[in-house]
Each structure stands twice: as C-alpha cells, then as structure tokens.
C-alpha cells in the first residue's frame, strides 16, 4: 500500500478540494493515460486495486506508471465513541484528485488493450475518468 515514509505532521485538517489540475495533467511518460474528469479523493487501496486490474489485463506486458500518490492522512474515531477528546487516529491515506489529473500511464501495449485495461481500473475509482493519448508537440 502506498503511503509516505515520514511526514512533517501526523494529522492534517480537512481542507477543500477545489480548482483544476495543472501539474500532472499531460501524458508525459507512456503512450496512453487514464485522466480524471471528476473531483474527489482516491484511497491507497483504490490505487493499488486499479494497478492490479491493469497489470492482470495486460498480462504483465508493457510498462505502467502510477502518477498519483496518497499523501493526505484521513483520521477516524472508533465506533461508539462520544464527540470530543481530540482528533481520531490515522486510518488510511488518500490522494486528492482534481479534474484533469492523469492517474495512470502505460506504454508497450496496443491502444485497444490499454483502453480495456483502463476501463477495468476506472471501475475501482469514485471519480469519473477518460482515456487519453500522448500528444506530440
């Protein structure tokens, strides 16, 4: 599971997920990419589930890049605990996703196979996605 090795602070405030992704919005490593068109947060488990779906579908062929990293800790209080008494403990890590962010990239496989693999991975996410190709400038 992806998570930071060390952080400056153990817990963070909730914050707001606004705006569009400008960094990481282009396919820069592979030939094809899976780009988010919706906004939300993706957990480390969902990122791993998507990676597994892609890897299994392409039968371990080609090269895959994961372009998102879960760097925000999410805290939860245990069940049946009253409010107050401080912030809960860190339960899982998420990556905040803005529209336009490229989530995965792949090369070394056909476009049809890449589309099928990314469709399988997209089913694991709570955000809407689209298939994109690398544009040569």
From Swiss-Prot:
PROSITE patterns: RIBOSOMAL_L16_1, RIBOSOMAL_L16_2. Pfam families: Ribosomal_L16. One of its GO terms (molecular function) is rRNA binding. CDD domains: Ribosomal_L16_L10e (cd01433). InterPro entries: Ribosomal_uL16, Ribosomal_uL16_bact-type, Ribosomal_uL16_CS, Ribosomal_uL16_dom, Ribosomal_uL16_sf. Keywords: Ribonucleoprotein, Ribosomal protein, RNA-binding, rRNA-binding, tRNA-binding. GO terms for cellular component: cytosolic large ribosomal subunit. GO terms for biological process: translation. Coiled coil: none annotated. Residues 1-22 are annotated as: Disordered. Binds 23S rRNA and is also seen to make contacts with the A and possibly P site tRNAs. HAMAP family: Ribosomal_uL16. PANTHER family: 50S/60S RIBOSOMAL PROTEIN L16, LARGE RIBOSOMAL SUBUNIT PROTEIN UL16M. Part of the 50S ribosomal subunit. Belongs to the universal ribosomal protein uL16 family. This is Large ribosomal subunit protein uL16. The gene is rplP.
């Amino acid at each position: 599971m992806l998570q930071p090795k060390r952080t400056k602070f153990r817990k963070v405030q909730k914050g707001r997920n606004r705006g569009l992704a400008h960094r990481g919005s282009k396919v820069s490593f592979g030939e094809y990419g899976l780009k988010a068109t919706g906004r939300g947060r993706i957990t480390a488990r969902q990122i791993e589930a998507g990676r597994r779906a892609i890897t299994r579908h392409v039968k371990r062929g080609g090269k895959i890049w994961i372009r998102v990293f879960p760097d925000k800790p999410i805290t939860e209080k245990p069940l049946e605990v009253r409010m107050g008494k401080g912030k809960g403990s860190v339960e899982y890590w998420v990556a905040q996703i803005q529209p336009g962010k490229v989530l995965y990239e792949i090369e070394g496989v056909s476009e049809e196979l890449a589309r099928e693999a990314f469709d399988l991975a997209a089913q694991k996410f709570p955000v809407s996605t689209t298939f994109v190709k690398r544009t040569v400038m």
